[in-house]
Amino acid sequence: MNNKNNLLFIPLGGCSEIGMNMYVYGYDDGKNIDYILVDAGVTFPNPEYNPGVDLIMPDTSFVEDNLSKFKAIFITHAHEDHIGSLTHLFEYIEAPIYCGKFTSFIAKSKIDKGGGNSDLVKIAPHYPKIIKAGSFKVGFVNI
């Protein structure tokens, strides 16, 4: 992008559908671009229309092509439509993963199952404490 200070939103899944939540946020200051990933979900196919298919995952090629620019991953909660693809994503991602305490147990289990580094999972501090991830400042609010 040529303009300074652009906020980008790239839904990889979860928009106009139920499940498969995965959202990329980007910030371009004109020199560098930083990304964060919010959620990493899957959806479950209808066996009537997709026999033999266990899970459907968003296309993560954008993430794979921009790995070094991803500063963090934030998981909102431990439902499969928000966390289910961690098993597969962590074949290649090395960014820290922030989530709540309960969600951290599920995330570590999924990453271990996929052969990734579960030490990347961090329990997010509650707001007003802020997590700095590249150009982003993120606060976790319990609902």
Q: What residues fall within each predicted segment?
A:
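Pre-active-site segment of Zn-dependent metallo-hydrolases
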Residues: 17-20, 27-75, 87-88, 92, ...
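C-terminal regulatory/interaction regions
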Residues: 1-2
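Short, structured coil segments at secondary-structure junctions
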Residues: 92-93, 134
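Catalytic core of the metallo-beta-lactamase
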Residues: 5-12, 17-29, 129-143
